[in-house]
Every structure is written in structure tokens, then in C-alpha cells.
């Protein structure tokens, strides 16, 4: 596939801690339910899976936030649970309930059935990547993504989201051998999955370790970070003559920043509970940092959003050699006012230009 030259590479350069004229911004879940146009497209698709498995619809919703806001990156519209769905677990999104699996993995016989899926069963994702790259026409880079081996294992064992992670932790403490087997398969599948996204045209990739923070110290390193590192070490790191940066985001992982930064990634995502300046000192500019505005700030109105954006940028400190990508500390809420997002993007671009020029 012939691709257009990249017109705005500020996001990629920031991830590699190269000089940039301003701090780039994109938002986790930027293509989502807070946008009326997303909801209209989802209604046409008939269901979440109908949306995610149709490359044209996936492309349409991926591009919707870029039509509204001058964001510095697009992120593939998909879901972290596509990989276990391809393993045969039967993913479904029930209205008002979120994702659930028809065939959760809870005992030895379930684990014995697991295998790395044929990537051809995920072709709709890679077709979407190619379609989005074509339609972006070099406007901004495209981010591919996957869930971390631990996070998707949580969903696989629980069968849905969880408040206490009782089932996955029962396996962790009672049959760690089974959990390690699941994680080995997940890591191998995720490596293949992200590399296929890169081959299809993703210019950066992100690993969402959404539930790493529910683990105790010591267990995080053993059951989450070790398998995240395994994925990162197996990724294609150069394509189209450029490095393909890797971002790792562990929600609730603030106490392990130094260890996460050493896993081989180019950038570490931060949730809103972490002091950005302190995080930068802890990782000593060895990696870029992404984040970390509290998503609930968007409900405080334009003035509060602009003030908090400036505070976040100031917290990072002198731009120097440190790379910073502005983002929320978690995904944007479906109830966020779209007009306030405009205020956020404008403030980040305007205020950070002055910081970088100074």
C-alpha cells in the first residue's frame, strides 16, 4: 500500500523525546460515545461488534474526533477484547452491561482449549488500519493498540468486568501454573496482533494494562509486567523508515514507574493520580511520558479545563530532552461535553507553544 507522507509527526517525535514545537495531544477513547456522530454511526451498525468488525465503520468513527478537533494522532477504533474473542470465547456487548464472554476461562479444561488465534480471524482489524491510513492521507499518525496479557486474562477469567477480581485472583493464588499458561498464550497472541497492525500501517502502538494496578507489589512484576515486557521485546520497531514507538499504560501503576519504564517501551502512560513532574524525575527522561489530566476535569467547564491543562503542562517542567504527550489519565467519559474538549485541545496547543518557544 502506498502511503502519503506524514504531514504532522509531532506526536511521534515527542514519543522519541525529540524537539517539538508544542506538546501534542490525543485522548484515550477519543472516538466514543461522548460524540453524537459516533452514536449515530453505532446505531447504523446495529451493535458495538457490528461497528468494530466493519472496517468502513471503524474508519468512520476513528476519523470523527479529528473532524472536530486538531488532535495530533488518531487511534484505531477497536477493542482490547478482540484477541480473546478470536480465541473462541464469544465476546458480546450487552446494553448497559459492557463486554462479557460466553465461554470464560476458569479451569484446566478451559485453559487446555486455548491457543494463539490465526491472525486471519482478525483481518477486519488490519483492514481497518489500512483503510484509516488511506483516509488519513498523512494528516496525523495512527496508533494501534492491544490489551496487556494480564488485563485480557482478567476479562477471560471473570467473563466480564469485575469489582474485586475474585475469579482471576483465585486462579493466581490457587493455580498460578494455569494463569501463567494463559498469560504465555496471551503474550504470544498480542505480539502477533500488534505486529500485524504495524504491518498494516500503525505508526505507533499502545499496550493498555488497565487492571495491572489491582495486583500487589511483587505479583504485578510476576503476572503483568513480565508478560508486557515479553510483548514489547517481540515487536517490530521500524517501518516505513521510521521507529515505531511503543507506549505502555498501567492504570494504578504509579508505584512501579521505574520498572515499567525499563520494559523496553518508548513512553509510559500515567493515570491522573501521579505527579507528572515527580514521574519525570523518577524515570530520568529515559522514556517519554503520556498524560495525565483527570478525565472528570472536563465536567468543570472551560475555565477549569484550561487552568488544569496549564497546570499539567507546567508540572512536566522544562521541555528540554523530555518527551511529553498530553492525554487524559484514563479514557474520556461518555458524558463529557464535546465543546469542552475543544477548549482543552486549544489550551494545550497554545500554552505549550509558548513553553517550547521559551
From Swiss-Prot:
Compartment annotation: Cytoplasm
CDD domains, A to Z: URO-D (cd00717)
Q: In which pathway does it act?
A: Porphyrin-containing compound metabolism; protoporphyrin-IX biosynthesis; coproporphyrinogen-III from 5-aminolevulinate: step 4/4
What are the alphabetically sorted keywords of the record?
Answer: Cytoplasm, Decarboxylase, Lyase, Porphyrin biosynthesis
* GO CC terms in record: cytosol
Q: Where is this site: Transition state stabilizer?
A: 79
Which SUPFAM superfamilies does this chain map to?
UROD/MetE-like (SSF51726)
| Annotated TM spans | none
Q: Known Gene3D superfamilies for this protein?
A: 3.20.20.210
Q: List the disulfide bonds.
A: none
Q: What class of enzyme is it?
A: lyase
- Alphabetical GO biological process terms: protoporphyrinogen IX biosynthetic process from glutamate
Under which EC number(s) is this enzyme classified? 4.1.1.37
A Pfam family per the record:
URO-D
The entry's substrate-binding residues are 29-33, 48, 79, 155, 210, 330
First-listed, main subcellular location of the protein, grouped into a coarse class: cytoplasm
A molecular function (GO) held by this record is: uroporphyrinogen decarboxylase activity
The reactions it catalyses are: uroporphyrinogen III + 4 H(+) = coproporphyrinogen III + 4 CO2
- UniProt cross-references to InterPro entries, sorted A to Z: UROD/MetE-like_sf (IPR038071), Uroporphyrinogen_deCO2ase_HemE (IPR006361), Uroporphyrinogen_deCOase (IPR000257)
How the protein assembles, per its UniProt entry?
Homodimer.
Family membership: Belongs to the uroporphyrinogen decarboxylase family.
Q: What does this protein do?
A: Catalyzes the decarboxylation of four acetate groups of uroporphyrinogen-III to yield coproporphyrinogen-III.
Q: What is this protein called?
A: Uroporphyrinogen decarboxylase
Gene name linked to the record = hemE
Amino acid at each position: 500500500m502506498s502511503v502519503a507522507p506524514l504531514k504532522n509527526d509531532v506526536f511521534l517525535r515527542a514519543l522519541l523525546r525529540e524537539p517539538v514545537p508544542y506538546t501534542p495531544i490525543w485522548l484515550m477513547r477519543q472516538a466514543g460515545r461522548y460524540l453524537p456522530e459516533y452514536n449515530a454511526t453505532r446505531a447504523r451498525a446495529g451493535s458495538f461488534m457490528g461497528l468494530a468488525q466493519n472496517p468502513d465503520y471503524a474508519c468512520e468513527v476513528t476519523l470523527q474526533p479529528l473532524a472536530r478537533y486538531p488532535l495530533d494522532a488518531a487511534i484505531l477504533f477497536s477493542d482490547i477484547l478482540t484477541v480473546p474473542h478470536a480465541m473462541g470465547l464469544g465476546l458480546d456487548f450487552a446494553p448497559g452491561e459492557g463486554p462479557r464472554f460466553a465461554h470464560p476461562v476458569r479451569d484446566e479444561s478451559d485453559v487446555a482449549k486455548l491457543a494463539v488465534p490465526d491472525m486471519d480471524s482478525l483481518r477486519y482489524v488490519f483492514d481497518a488500519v489500512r483503510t484509516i491510513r488511506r483516509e488519513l492521507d498523512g494528516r496525523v499518525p495512527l496508533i494501534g493498540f492491544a490489551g496487556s496479557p494480564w488485563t485480557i486474562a482478567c476479562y477471560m477469567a471473570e467473563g466480564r468486568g469485575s469489582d474485586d477480581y475474585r475469579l482471576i485472583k483465585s486462579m493466581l493464588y490457587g493455580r498460578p501454573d494455569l494463569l501463567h499458561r494463559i498469560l504465555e498464550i496471551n503474550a504470544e497472541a498480542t505480539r502477533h496482533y500488534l505486529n500485524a497492525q504495524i504491518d498494516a500501517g500503525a505508526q505507533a502502538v499502545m499496550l493498555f494494562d488497565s487492571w495491572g494496578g489491582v495486583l500487589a507489589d511483587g505479583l504485578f512484576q510476576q503476572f503483568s509486567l513480565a508478560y508486557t515486557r515479553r510483548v514489547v521485546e517481540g515487536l517490530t520497531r521500524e517501518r516505513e523508515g521510521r521507529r515505531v514507538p511503543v507506549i505502555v499504560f498501567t492504570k494504578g501503576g504509579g508505584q512501579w514507574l521505574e520498572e515499567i519504564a525499563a520494559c523496553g517501551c518508548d513512553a509510559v502512560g500515567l493515570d491522573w493520580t501521579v505527579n507528572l513532574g515527580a514521574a519525570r524525575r523518577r524515570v530520568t527522561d529515559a522514556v517519554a511520558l503520556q498524560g495525565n489530566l483527570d478525565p472528570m476535569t472536563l465536567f468543570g467547564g472551560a475555565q477549569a479545563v484550561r487552568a488544569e491543562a496549564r497546570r499539567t503542562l507546567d508540572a512536566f517542567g522544562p521541555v528540554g530532552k523530555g518527551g511529553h504527550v498530553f492525554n487524559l489519565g484514563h479514557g474520556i467519559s461518555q458524558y463529557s461535553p464535546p465543546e469542552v474538549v475543544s477548549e482543552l485541545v486549544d489550551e494545550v496547543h497554545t500554552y505549550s507553544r509558548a513553553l517550547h518557544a521559551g
